[in-house]
Swiss-Prot record:
Belongs to the tigger transposable element derived protein family. It comes from the Eukaryota. It comes from Mus musculus (Mouse). The lineage of its organism: Eukaryota, Metazoa, Chordata, Craniata, Vertebrata. Residues 1-54, 202-238, 375-400, 548-581 are annotated as: Disordered. Keywords: DNA-binding, Nucleus. This is Tigger transposable element derived 5.
Amino acid sequence: MYPASPPAGPALHPVPHRARLPQPRCLAEPPRSPAPGPGSTARPPPPPAPGPRPRVAVKMTFRKAYSIKDKLQAIERVKGGERQASVCRDFGVPGGTLRGWLKDEPKLRWFLDQLGGEVGTQRKKMRLANEEEIDRAVYSWFLTLRQHGVPLSGPVIQAQAEAFARQIYGPECTFKASHGWFWRWQKRHGISSQRIYGEAESPVAGPAPVKEEPAQSPGAVLVPDGAPATLPHSEGGYGDEQIYNANVTGLYWRLLPEQASTPGTGDSKEPGGCSRRWRSDRVTVLLAANLTGSHKLKPLVIGQLPDPPSLRHHNQDKFPASYRYSPDAWLSRPLLRGWFFEEFVPGVKRYLRRSCLQQKAVLLVAHPPCPSWATSMPPLEESEETPRQCQPELLGSPEELQTPDGAVRVLFLSKGTSRAHIPAPLEHGVVAAFKHLYKRELLRLAVSCASGSPLDFMRSFVLKDMLYLAGLSWDLVQAGSIERCWLLGLRAAFEPGQQPAHQVEETAEHSRVLSDLTHLAALAYKRLAPEEVAQWLHLDDDGGLPEGCREEVAPAAPPSPASLPSSIGAGEEEEEATEQGGVLVPTAGEAVWGLETALRWLESQDPREVGPLRLVQLRSLITMARRLGGIGPSAVTSDDGV
């Protein structure tokens, strides 16, 4: 028997066992869709599988370091009203960087003040020396010797730096002026080595032994970058904003038209036409500005009071004008020198740094003018009676009035009487405009205090108010007027026959100020003639009196309160008037005490918000209350010599 056969079908063969290998997903083919039938629409192909995108080569941008000059230029453009987006686009910086510059502006200004010079504006990092005192001492010593033509080399400067270190920190100081310190000192102050052929001056002492460094060529000395080897005094090359002019003028700072028109008794009138009793109220004002009028320095007021009561316990740096004392109220040589180094040089350097200009300037100063009655005297050789003290004294030489590096200096204009005479630019209308504006504001104050007598106003108007009034009047002088006066003054040296430009505008402005003065004088003094107002305006046009040409005249004593008219008596009449209609009326002493308390509070506030008008009005009320009540003067309402 045979076994049963399997069912019909494919033959089954044994398959050997194999391990199943996992197939990669990337090789797996997507399932195919069935072929579309005759009545179906075609479907779009599926999107590509997600995967890594191809890399694109990106060029890296390098960060750019901006100098302090660039940062300050951007800051000035934003402060000038330009949009920050436009400034960022021009400089190629994001908005956050520009806002950071604006935030760091005080630090940038402080760094320039510490470093100084044109080199400081080119710095990109605000880093000072580790030993700042030694660095400053060496740099000042270097500038002083280079001004006198003394050649200096690296080893000499290094030895002097170590000597300064021992003087500052004591003999135990371990400071060493290495070659690295000297290299950093050169780069910090912009000093390079140059070969000098012939110095301007020989050294005062014997020639110091000079030992050259290997890096320096034989005969090379150190000079500041951009400066000639001999530092000549007439190097020129100044821009319009770097040329300044200063001029002095006399001013009766609280003299009103009524007092000026009152004739003096006997020979109590000085040649200018004013009574001698008001000579103590005469001050000298120094005005200075650059050619464009964009920088006007604070006026300098010189008076005869050594310690004015109204200026005590006050920070005079906040005043719009400065005050200095002189026995005869004239600009002497020490005063001019002190003003030049204490106010002019720091103010000009701050302005030049703010404007991103080179740190150099020149100040043109006219010789002190003499009144017509003094200049008409015969010279000393022809008249032995002319005192020597009436001869005008020179205020100094250009060598004395200049900075150690010679960047800021003074030049005196010619004083000849022929064509060689160069008039001061500010004499052509600027000084007269300042005085007319000052007297207009003075009359406005007098009209506002018309409730009291003129003596009440003069006692209430103190020297502190005068400084504010002088600063206000100087600010009212337009920059365009100053620039036109410069052109008019300098044209005399080149085109003496040509007419001044913009004469119509100047005449219209002058006429408007004179019209205001005449109107205010008519309001304050109804019986005053226009000729008397004109005399009051031109009373101090002589420009001031030079040294020694004044007589020592003591200020007039103020009238006693008993001699002044009073409508309210003291004693029993005041007690009878204390009660009127059941309302308690304060006494004169209580009223004066309350007004003085209010005055002390008002003076403690910000002077720019208060202004001189309210202070003068309140002092006028106090003076009137004291006069009506028969009370003597007090220390609160100081009269500054009235």
